[in-house]
Amino acid sequence: MESIRWLLTVAQFDFDMKLVQSXAIVNYVANK
């Protein structure tokens, strides 16, 4: 059970990173 929670945490972190990156890209393009 503990490993599932760990996997979900990693997946959430990965999702957050992708969200931050895409947002940064959108921001960069919008400010050009």
UniProtKB/Swiss-Prot annotation:
Protein name: Glutathione S-transferase 8.2
EC number: 2.5.1.18
Subcellular location: Cytoplasm
Enzyme class: transferase
Entry comment on modification after translation: The N-terminus is blocked.
GO cellular component: cytoplasm
Subunit text: Homodimer.
Gene Ontology MF terms in the entry: glutathione transferase activity
Family: Belongs to the GST superfamily. Alpha family.
Catalytic activity annotation: RX + glutathione = an S-substituted glutathione + a halide anion + H(+)
Keyword Cytoplasm belongs to the record: yes
Function: Conjugation of reduced glutathione to a wide number of exogenous and endogenous hydrophobic electrophiles.
Positions bound to glutathione: Q21, S22
Top-level taxonomic group: Eukaryota
Keywords: Cytoplasm, Transferase
